[in-house]
Regions:
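Sec-dependent bacterial lipoprotein signal peptides
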Residues: 1-16
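Alpha-helix boundary/interfacial micro-motifs
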Residues: 3, 19, 103-104
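Bacterial lipoprotein signal-peptidase II cleavage site
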Residues: 16-30
Length: 202
């Protein structure tokens, strides 16, 4: 009897040792991650830059009766403009210098030419327009409002701006709602300088 039990136990152990082992469940390796494509940066718009200046000279002769010096004034309106590839204005800057000269009856200059000329923008509040302006704004504030209005517009759109004649000295004042309370200066000379600067843009 013992021999039979021993034989049965040996057979069971042998069968257990020969039974196929169930392989451990393998964890699949994580799939290689595909990097997300980098966000494409749009190519910058092509830009052209142009500058121009317009000179206007006026004056008065020497007054022989009063022996008053003659005068001459040179007003130079300057414009720098940047245009994108669609022809729209992305940057614009205006400034003006007013050079005044005096001369005597011999035609000799009596003005001190060693003094530099300060532009309207450089003068800032010292230009003194606010005290005589109906909107109480200085020249630099008004030209800044006009410059801002031009951004995003084409030169043709700038030229097409409606204007009105306020008086003999202000024949081209902006007649658009956005500038009614910010610009009362004559923009004719600035508009002409803009057209010239845009034509020079490269």
């Amino acid at each position: 009897m013992k021999k039979i039990l021993v034989a049965l136990m040996a057979t069971a152990m042998l069968m257990a040792g020969c039974a196929p082992k169930t392989p451990a469940a393998s964890t699949p390796a994580p799939a290689a991650s595909t990097p997300a494509p980098a966000a494409s940066t749009p190519a910058p718009a092509a830009t052209k830059i142009g500058t121009a200046s317009i000179v206007n000279v006026k004056g008065a002769n020497y007054n022989t009766a009063d022996k008053k010096d003659g005068t001459a004034q040179s007003d130079v309106t300057m414009c720098t403009v940047m245009l994108d590839d669609a022809g729209k204005i992305t940057y614009v800057n205006f400034d003006v210098t007013q050079s005044k000269f005096a001369f005597n009856d011999k035609g000799e200059l009596t003005t001190d030419l060693t003094k530099g000329v300060i532009s309207k923008k450089e003068l800032g509040a010292n230009y003194g327009m606010a005290k005589v302006s109906e909107i109480k704004k200085e020249w630099f504030e008004q030209i800044a409002a006009y410059e801002q209005w031009l951004i995003g517009k084409t030169v043709d759109e700038a030229v097409a701006m409606k204007t009105f004649e306020k008086d003999a000295s202000h024949k081209e004042v902006p007649d658009v709602a956005e500038l009614k309370t910010s610009v009362t200066i004559d923009i004719g000379g600035y508009r002409n300088a803009l057209v010239k600067a845009a034509a020079n843009a490269k």
